[in-house]
Regions:
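Second-shell loop/turn segments in exported
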Residues: 32-36, 68-81
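Bacterial signal peptide processing site
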Residues: 25-27
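Hydrophobic/aromatic-rich core segments of domains that either
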Residues: 98-154
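C-terminal motif of bacterial Sec signal peptides marking the signal peptidase cleavage site
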Residues: 20-23
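Post-signal peptide N-terminal segment of mature Sec-exported envelope proteins
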Residues: 31-53
Length: 184
């Protein structure tokens, strides 16, 4: 189990308050605003995956900065760090994403720095090339599935999700998702 220092705890509380302020500006796409049938199917699989995680009798899932502190301070079956959500979401939506003819990959921002954050990207490769994902506009079909922030199946336009980070120390990178043997 990794212990955090008092300074890290104070920084986490500060970041949490910043996230509350940021959350008022950038919000997830509302379910009723999703018109693309493929994304609607992905959203249903995403919602089911989050529900399954939160109701899993073998693991205790949490979310957000307070969830991070909970996971880091307790041993056992606690889950909820952003990379753990990334793996769980990837596993839960992969077959649905592929059935829609879409692709998925991982994304990380601030890799190796304070505020590192992981999530899953889904996109329609017929409408945007993989090499262009990080430069997508709101009008392009590139979406972030991020259950970590609120423990809910939140979907963001990638261009908006990138603005949620208060400080970008390391630019966003696409990453392959390889399921670990254990989420610990």
């Amino acid at each position: 189990m990794r212990k955090i220092t008092a300074n890290q705890f104070i920084q986490s509380c500060f970041l949490l308050s910043c996230l509350f302020l940021t959350a008022c500006v950038i919000t997830p796409i509302q379910r009723d605003d999703i018109n693309d049938p493929a994304l609607q199917n992905i959203q249903r699989a995403f919602s089911q995956t989050v529900s399954d995680a939160l109701n899993d009798p073998d693991e205790d899932w949490t979310s957000g900065w307070l969830g991070n502190m909970w996971v880091n301070f307790h041993e056992g079956k606690q889950r909820g760090l952003c990379y753990q959500w990334k793996y769980r979401i990837h596993t839960g939506v992969k077959s649905t994403v592929h059935a829609q003819g879409w692709q998925l990959t991982g994304i990380v921002i601030n890799k190796g720095a304070d505020g590192e954050h992981h999530a899953v990207i889904v996109y329609d490769p017929k409408r945007i090339q993989t090499a262009q994902l990080l430069h997508a506009t709101v009008k392009q079909p590139v979406f972030v599935l991020d259950a970590w922030r609120q423990g809910m199946p939140d979907i963001y336009f990638l261009s908006e999700w990138l603005q949620l980070a208060r400080h970008i120390r390391v630019p966003a990178q696409l990453i392959n998702i390889k399921q670990p043997v254990s989420l610990n």
